[in-house]
């Protein structure tokens, strides 16, 4: 079977979202399917590309900005010419008459089409005026767009989204790309926590740092450190985090590494004992979510904590659930939980073998093409 994986943005192999897309592409291929990636490149002019081949060049200026959001005929033409059977679209919250027409044309010639919505619900992620204007258009057309699809792929527990049936999967793991952590070699009276993300307010890292401020309000025998890895999404998050650090003199205990990947990221993980997931999903109205980060922590072989509902991990012995509210994270609770851990990194990693990307993407194929099972 021939699959076209369609995204409406750029593709950078070092970017976290692009890495996930690479894993999904490889998973389709591992299941025996010929798979092609269509993405936008804006390095010189605005160009739509499939596997390195330019299928549309929109130029620059206002015309290019408009065409990249409205011209999808080149995608359909490519799909027809190359006899694509299945189109897997990653949503960019861009439901409009042009995306609807694209899907209708694909369906008319017999292609199966699904759309992945990475995070749902997502309306509360739109907080400034420009973003809210973009959301208005999506709200107007998304139910009609969903009606054209064969299904919506979700990492939530919703059976339907925008009136369309869902295929519920988990964020997966590409085990070949995630090295298990090595043993930490820091002093026994230290606990090193790590949080890896493009840092948004819904990650709730401020709650962890507020918790450290309370923890260090008195003299402590156990020294707890928080390694924050990743860029801040906006100055708002960065200013909030740095303010809490400075006001509480936590510069020695909260280490802002910036964005790291590859061996540099592996080296930081090797220093760390405990993973920090999301502690602020309630801020954007999300209760159920299966984040990629939780799975990466497990693949690394470290225990971790989060505050949402993740049915793949909620009952695991190496997972600590925290309240989904605005209270500072209780650092002593983390210390006591960590002291009781008996699972080895290998045991933690082996517990999620069923969450490979190959298995997750096979579930999509089996749902869309049941006769091929």
For each predicted feature, which ranges?
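Glycosyltransferase donor-sugar binding loop
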Residues: 225-240, 258
């Amino acid at each position: 079977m021939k699959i076209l994986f369609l995204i409406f943005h750029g593709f950078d192999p070092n970017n976290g979202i692009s890495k996930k897309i690479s894993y999904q592409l490889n998973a389709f291929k591992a299941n025996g399917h010929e798979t092609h990636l269509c993405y936008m490149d804006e390095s010189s002019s605005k160009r739509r590309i499939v596997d390195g081949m330019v299928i549309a060049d929109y130029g620059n200026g206002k015309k290019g900005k408009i065409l990249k959001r409205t011209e999808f005929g080149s995608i359909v033409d490519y799909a027809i010419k190359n006899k694509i059977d299945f189109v897997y679209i990653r949503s960019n919250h861009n439901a409009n008459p042009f995306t609807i027409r694209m899907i209708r044309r694909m369906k008319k010639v017999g292609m199966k089409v699904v759309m992945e919505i990475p995070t749902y619900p997502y309306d509360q992620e739109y907080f400034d005026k420009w973003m809210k204007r973009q959301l208005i258009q999506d709200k107007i057309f998304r139910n009609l767009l969903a009606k054209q699809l064969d299904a919506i792929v979700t990492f939530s527990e919703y059976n339907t989204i925008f009136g369309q049936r869902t295929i519920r999967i988990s964020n997966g793991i590409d085990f070949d790309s995630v090295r298990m952590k090595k043993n930490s070699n820091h002093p026994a009276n230290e606990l090193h926590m790590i949080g890896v993300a493009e840092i948004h307010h819904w990650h709730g890292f401020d709650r962890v740092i507020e918790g450290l401020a309370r923890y260090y309000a008195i003299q402590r025998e156990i020294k707890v450190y928080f390694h924050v890895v990743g860029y801040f999404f906006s100055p708002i998050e960065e200013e909030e985090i740095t303010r809490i650090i400075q006001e509480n003199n936590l510069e020695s205990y909260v280490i802002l590494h910036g964005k790291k990947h590859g061996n540099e990221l592996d080296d930081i993980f090797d220093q760390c004992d405990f993973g920090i997931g999301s502690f602020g999903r309630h801020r954007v109205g999300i209760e159920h979510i299966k984040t990629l980060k939780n799975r990466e922590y497990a693949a690394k072989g470290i225990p971790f904590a989060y505050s949402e509902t993740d049915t793949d991990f909620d009952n695991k012995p190496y997972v600590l659930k925290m309240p989904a509210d605005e209270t500072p994270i209780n650092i002593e609770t983390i210390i006591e939980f960590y002291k009781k851990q008996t699972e080895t990194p290998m045991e933690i990693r082996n517990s999620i073998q069923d969450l490979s990307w190959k298995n997750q993407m096979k579930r999509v194929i089996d749902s869309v093409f049941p006769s091929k099972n």
